[in-house]
Amino acid sequence: MSDSKLAGQFFDAAIGLLTRVRDEESDSIAAAGAAVADTVASGGRLFAFGAGHSSLAAQDVVYRAGGLALMNLLTVPGAVGVDVMPATLGSALERVDGLASAVLDSSPATAGDLLVIVSLSGRNALPVEMAQNARALGLKVIGLTSVAYAENTRSRHASGGFLRDHCDIVLDSKIAIGDAELTAPGVEAPFAPASTVVTSAIMQAMLAAAVEQLVARGIEPPMLRSGNVDGGHEWNGRVMTEYRDRIFYRH
């Protein structure tokens, strides 16, 4: 069986995007890593949020083998979309004004903490208001988004602003509008989205930069090990006990 031409093209597209992000966003990723390290060093808590498929990159850094134990998932019931029926409910919730405020008010997030918001378009009410309200509460906000949307589409928030307009640090995923890398004869719509690959890589790169910063400051990063290696559960238990006041996925 011959190799798939389109499969190879997708890999090329994803690698190209990752290379571009590495080359063009290195300063921003380093700044985001430093902000995470600052929060860890000062006793703050870390949170990640994403709606729809953007939630995948947020989920990937929570309770993760090889990840920072202090990263907590900020959730909005139904906003992931694929976990509810109909799945389109998730898209609708992203456009509801006031929802972000209710979520933050009922969360443990407080001044001095840090929130990473992942939103590909950054144009809907939920991520925009999440950033606005988080900063008003005194959180440091990192936005992971595609700046192309802010430059080429209209905001769906009453303010006319995008996620990038309300963040302390912006990480640009470089994903094209529509999030589909390939076209082919006989296929009426573009296909093969790469946003999950790229945004997850950016999140991991940011945390790697944070680990580097912590070590440089003489602080041992609170890391988790895989539960599928010998001693992993015991290691994680010790870490979670030591940092139990900053870890909320165990409560």
Swiss-Prot record:
It comes from the Bacteria. Signal peptide: none annotated. Residues 36-221 form the SIS domain. GO terms for biological process: carbohydrate derivative metabolic process. PANTHER family: PHOSPHOHEPTOSE ISOMERASE, SEDOHEPTULOSE 7-PHOSPHATE ISOMERASE / DNAA INITIATOR-ASSOCIATING FACTOR FOR REPLICATION INITIATION. PROSITE patterns: SIS. GO terms for molecular function: carbohydrate derivative binding. Belongs to the UPF0309 family. This is UPF0309 protein SGR_3073. It comes from Streptomyces griseus subsp. griseus (strain JCM 4626 / CBS 651.72 / NBRC 13350 / KCC S-0626 / ISP 5235). Pfam families: SIS_2 (PF13580).
